[in-house]
Amino acid sequence: MIVLITGASSGFGWEAAKLCVAKGHRVIGCARRTERLQALQKELGDAFFPLPFDIADADALNAAFERLPEDWRAIDVLVNNAGLALGQAPAHESRLADWEQMIATN
């Protein structure tokens, strides 16, 4: 089974990738932080394919999937874990750019 996990560079996504590989699945790990995905690949080996890109960028997403080898493209499970929270100000004091980025990502 091939599992695609967004937000795989830390937290729940990181742990989910480790668990899925331990259960015998192949995992595509997506996140913006290339170095964190590479560290996870070192830990998990060939059962993990790092696919760095910004999920809020449609062009980057399309380009990323073009980089996937053919035998990694039949995705069985999506763990849609990517997300972010910018600014902790009340809504009326928040920046519009922060809201736009959160909506695009989450």
From Swiss-Prot:
Does the record's keyword annotation contain Disulfide bond? Answer: no
Q: What is its EC number?
A: 1.1.1.-
The GO terms this record gives for MF are: oxidoreductase activity
List positions binding NADP(+): 4-28
Q: Give the first-level EC class, as a single word.
A: oxidoreductase
Under InterPro entries, the record lists: NAD(P)-bd_dom_sf, SDR_fam
Instruction: Print the keywords alphabetically.
Output: NADP, Oxidoreductase
The record's listing under Gene3D superfamilies reads: NAD(P)-binding Rossmann-like Domain
Cell wall biogenesis/degradation listed as a keyword = no
Which family does this protein fall into?
Belongs to the short-chain dehydrogenases/reductases (SDR) family.
Its recorded name reads Probable NADP-dependent dehydrogenase in aabA 3'region
Organism, scientific name: Dichelobacter nodosus (Bacteroides nodosus)
